[in-house]
Amino acid sequence: MYKQLDTLLAQAGISLTDQQKQRLLGYVSLLDKWNKAYNLTSVREPRDMLVRHIMDSIVVSPYLQGLRFIDVGTGPGLPGIPLAIVRPDANFTLLDSLGKRVRFLRQVQHELRLDNIEPVQSRVEAFVAEPPFDGVISRAFASLQDMVSWCHHLPAAHHGRFYALKGGVPQDELQSLPAGVSVDQLIRLQVPMLEGERHLVVLKSD
């Protein structure tokens, strides 16, 4: 799979160290192993995980501004763990309410020696951000309206951003954003070998 990952990274124009590549593959291996017992993802094949989980996550990396991020509704660590591997300079809090997922995240943290992630079991509304985060990230977590409503207390007041990974452009969601929140960027993502559109919606508080 190393060769497949190399090919995908080259197609995406992403340059990583050998250690980063090995950690990404190690994460896929752990996800595949735990998935058999814990049903963490509907994607069953490791080769598909490379495209639909790893590449789909790390193409967001160039657009993240800041050093402290929280991945809300992270599930098995997506996109937080792949992003933490490719952004060792930044810290990622991985938030999920389900114990089995958080146990998996802690195992990944231990086995891959990732010191820039912090798995936390909590509902997003109950989590206290001290200090607030540079960015709040979500992938298949909620509508933009719900994301802003549930996570409004998490980003830093002036420079904090919401980063939502979406498929097609969510026009209905964009038109129903709550007052005081606007679109900062709408970025079409290029994910090698992935069918369908992918977009990153970046929101800011006015």
Curated annotation (Swiss-Prot):
It catalyses: guanosine(527) in 16S rRNA + S-adenosyl-L-methionine = N(7)-methylguanosine(527) in 16S rRNA + S-adenosyl-L-homocysteine. Its EC number is 2.1.1.170. S-adenosyl-L-methionine binds at G73, L78, V124, E125, R139. The keyword Cytoplasm applies. It comes from the Bacteria. GO terms for cellular component: cytosol. InterPro entries: rRNA_ssu_MeTfrase_G, SAM-dependent_MTases_sf. One of its GO terms (molecular function) is rRNA (guanine-N7-)-methyltransferase activity. Keywords: Cytoplasm, Methyltransferase, rRNA processing, S-adenosyl-L-methionine, Transferase. The keyword Metal-binding does not apply. Its main location: cytoplasm. It is found in: Cytoplasm. Pfam families: GidB. Coiled coil: none annotated. Belongs to the methyltransferase superfamily. RNA methyltransferase RsmG family. NCBIfam families: rsmG_gidB. Specifically methylates the N7 position of guanine in position 527 of 16S rRNA. This is Ribosomal RNA small subunit methyltransferase G. It comes from Edwardsiella ictaluri (strain 93-146).
